[in-house]
Amino acid sequence: MRILRTPDTCFDGLKDYPFEPNYTQITTDDGSALRIHHLDEGARDGDLVLCLHGQPVWSYLYRKMVPYLTQSGLRVIAPDLPGYGKSDKPAAREDYSYERQVEWMGQWLEENDFNNITVFGQDWGGLIGLRLVANHPDRFARVVISNTGLPYNPTTSEQLLKEIQQFRTDAPTPSLMAMQKAISGMPSGDPALKFAYWQKFCWESEQLPVGMMMQMMMERPSTPVMAVNFLMNQLGLFNYSPCRSDVAKAYDAPFPDASYKMGPRAMPSHVPTTSASA
């Protein structure tokens, strides 16, 4: 397995992220060494809260929660999933699967011997975290999940499944705007069809604009700011946009070039919405 490691300098000067890094080495099924990063903040004898992030973010997501939790006497552990943040990044699409993330994080959990855990899982962190609870029930005391779940409906018609599979196979890559429109409409209609826009956009966008997307979703910038960022991104110059925020910079930090983005590109396709999900 070819594994990439983001240089530490990429994370220099991140706003509101003063935390010391901690690293654990695990072994993949082909014998490769894989290093997983995590935050470990607060009193060592405090009740342990495990914060698991989703796609395409990393432990930076929890930067504002950590101080509140530690001030309450809790110990906070926030890892970066393999492929994200300061953790190592397997370089091939086939390196990523739901099962492998569960296996890797299970090894990480055992190596650190964490116990009496309250797990908070968001997005993929919920999917992976719930499997960790099932596989290691004696290590967990409480479960809190948010914004997570499989967009799979067993009553979806065969015709709709064929439409989704045909869309993913034959349709042109959706634009960022088309993808966002589809995702924002997920509460109505069939979520699997709309989620397919996210799956296809992520996989087929070699230069997946992680930072720009996070700035849009988390900060809701004004129309002029969005227009400038869209233009700069189209020109391949988003890193130089005068409207690029600290949040965008932080979520771009793990990915110095496109080769590091295989995790966030590949993982949405592993959500089982159709038989083509693999």
Predicted segments with their positions:
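Flexible "cap/lid" subdomain of the alpha/beta-hydrolase fold that forms the substrate-access gate
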Residues: 1-21, 36-41, 48, 61, ...
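Short, solvent-exposed loop/turn segments that connect beta-strands within catalytic domains
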Residues: 28-34
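Short beta-strand element of the alpha/beta-hydrolase
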Residues: 46-53
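Conserved residues at beta->alpha junctions
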Residues: 53-56, 255
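The serine-hydrolase catalytic nucleophile loop
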Residues: 55-66
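Short hydrophobic signal-anchor/transmembrane segments that target glycosyltransferases
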Residues: 68-70
